[in-house]
Design a protein with these regions (language model features):
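Nucleic-acid 5′ end/cap handling module spanning
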Residues: 2-11, 16-70, 146, 164-299
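Covalent nucleotidyltransferase
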Residues: 34-171
């Protein structure tokens, strides 16, 4: 049947919607985001300022490119013929494929520009791209199915491995198609700073055990970090940070969890007050930022 891979209709499925901090969120978004990124439990990739699309090549070889939202009749709208520059890539994909991505214009990003183009009649959309010499690109950032195997219940770590294999094969060697690169930890933090400093849309971070949900994901399984957060995540824009203070001088030292052996440099994440108080070791309490190698202050 059209749109089906195995027993699932990937054309008519509900798109995954990514969680982001509510506007009235009371806690410190910057610190929470920082803590999550350095927890070792998240990966993240660039978010293009484009328009969500799923590319499907079903079990019978039928090709579709459908958006997140459906038309007024509640039907998915196929737009794959609006981007003939992607035709060779579409046709090369194996049957049983569903890739998630964004249609975007390089160096001229903006979702409104994309909806304006794809909202035209097919011939007009193609003509406008040719006249302006600006051709829509497809940015792949996730995989629902590949060669008939359904990956929706697999964690993002597994899906990234599949994406990398696709990207490193002939399917990643087509013009107008590019694949997301995922980062984690300090490298992800630096990339967020770099992307937002360049005026790009932002980043989506995803917990490593996150499958593909239909509709909205649970809180903090995915988090959109966008340029609109510049007032609260200001460090993403400068990328500058001072070195962290080493010695902890707070009042909770008896319960403190971050310590270093001043002689060997070995760090410990446990309560060591009693040993410290005995005065027979070279232990010293250190700040949480120093323990994790985080910035002392963010500019």
């Amino acid at each position: 049947m059209e749109g089906y891979i195995g027993n699932k209709n990937f054309v008519d499925m509900e798109a995954m919607r990514y969680w982001q901090f509510p506007l009235n969120y009371k806690k410190d978004k910057k610190q929470e985001t920082y803590d999550l990124i350095f927890s070792g439990r998240y990966v993240g990739a660039l978010k293009r300022d484009g328009y969500y699309q799923r590319v499907i090549k079903d079990d019978d070889g039928n090709i579709f490119m459908v958006a997140r939202d459906k038309n007024v009749k509640g039907e998915p709208v196929d737009k794959h013929e609006w981007v003939p520059q992607l035709r060779n890539w579409f046709e090369s994909l194996p049957n049983g494929t569903c890739l998630i991505g964004e249609i975007y214009l390089p160096n001229d990003e903006g979702s409104r520009k994309i909806t304006s183009l794809l909202g035209c009649l097919k011939e007009k959309c193609i003509a406008r791209q040719q006249e302006q010499n600006k051709f829509l690109h497809f940015y792949v950032f996730d995989v629902c199915a590949w060669k008939g195997e359904n990956y929706m219940s697999k964690p993002i770590e597994d899906r990234i491995r599949v994406l990398n294999k696709i990207n490193n094969s002939i399917y990643g060697n087509y013009p107008y198609v590019d694949f997301a690169t995922y980062y984690e930890g300090a490298e992800l933090w630096d990339k967020i700073s770099e992307y937002l400093a360049k005026g790009l849309e932002g980043v989506v971070i995803t917990r490593k055990d996150c499958p593909i949900y239909e509709k909205r994901t649970p809180a903090r399984m995915t988090i959109k970090i966008k340029k609109e957060l510049s007032n609260t995540i200001d460090c993403f824009f400068t990328g500058r940070a001072s070195a962290p203070t080493k010695a902890y001088t707070g009042k909770q030292v008896e319960e403190w969890m971050y310590w270093e052996d001043a002689r060997t440099g070995e760090k410990f994440n446990e309560r060591l007050w009693k040993k410290y108080d005995e005065g027979t070791t070279s232990l010293m309490p250190i700040t949480k930022n120093y323990y994790y190698g985080w910035a002392g202050s963010l500019e």
